[in-house]
Amino acid sequence: MEKSTVYFTDFRCSVGTSQLDKLKKLCVAAGIKNIDMDGKFVAIKMHFGELGNLAFLRPNYAKAVADLCKEQGGMPFLTDCNTLYPGSRKNALDHLDCANLNGFNPISTGCQIIIGDGLRGTDEVEVPVVNGEYCKTALIGHAVMDADVFISLTHLKGHESTGFGGAIKNIGMGCGSRAGKMQQHASGKPAVREKLCRGCGRCAKECGSDAITYVNKKAVIDYDKCKGCGRCIGACSFDAIYNPNYNANELLDRKMAEYAQAVCYDRPCFHISLVQDISPNCDCHGENDAPILPDIGMFASFDPVALDQACADACLKAAPIANSQLGEHLSQPGWHCHHDHFKDSNPNIEWQATLDQAEKIGLGTRQYELKRI
């Protein structure tokens, strides 16, 4: 497969310009105007942030992309699907309230918001996964599949289960209905290392399913309630909660790539990733830890695999921030350094499996040419 082109611009701005101007220029250079949007519905998939989290992308970025779509005659809307776990985005009403509270509304974004899988997270379409190995079909939010054109607008950050959350995760996990998310997460559930558990209560507080209680000051997981989302793993500061299924995260990664294939296959797609506020964990948390790496820039491509690879490569070349989870890990005596910022931040991950599987099934290629704008 030939190399894909990924376009890049940094966040530096001279007087009289803005990051929004640079984002629009990046998208135009990357070819967004080559997509026929005239009279067509354009889904812009992004994460509105959990309440309390401040690392998500500002709504101004969404407006810049929506404005470009409208200039081309498109009818854009922002979309995301409901979460598997309880929280502020578990149904469409709460999800819309959360989006509004975090600044996303028709005025700030220039378009409407539609929750992709409906009121209860059950408005889904069963979509074939071309070349799928782990998922023959995917359960995708109906509104996502109703769109004529699909654009992903991604905040790249670390992730406690997948290593980092890039375009493929935004598409694959984000566009899955609640049942679709369950299918992806069903590879394994966490367990507790009692010797390491301090009984601090952070995991129980983070669990949206009320699946964690304490016996003799040690965490105990009720597997009848546990959804397998892995939020407790990221919440624990003592490595006391882990996934005993050694390949559970890898299976999650590969399923996620196949779900992204279902969303993108055989229709016009365009992908944008902003590498800033690189927190160690997902924006699904109700908080965000300090960034592990400095802000890097904005990337765009027609190929989500090449895009994720380019973003990952840029992150791996960056110097860690000392006062961060990554910096603290690397400063610990005896810490086993993986020379991989994502793995050194969250050791029990296999992020490259996502890109391997995505390339294998034809979603894109990991080989790319980077063009700076």
Where are these regions (language model features)?
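Terminal amphipathic helices with adjacent charged low-complexity linkers/tails
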Residues: A66-D67
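Extended, low-polarity segments enriched in aliphatic/aromatic residues
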Residues: E2-Y61, E71-D80, Y85-I373
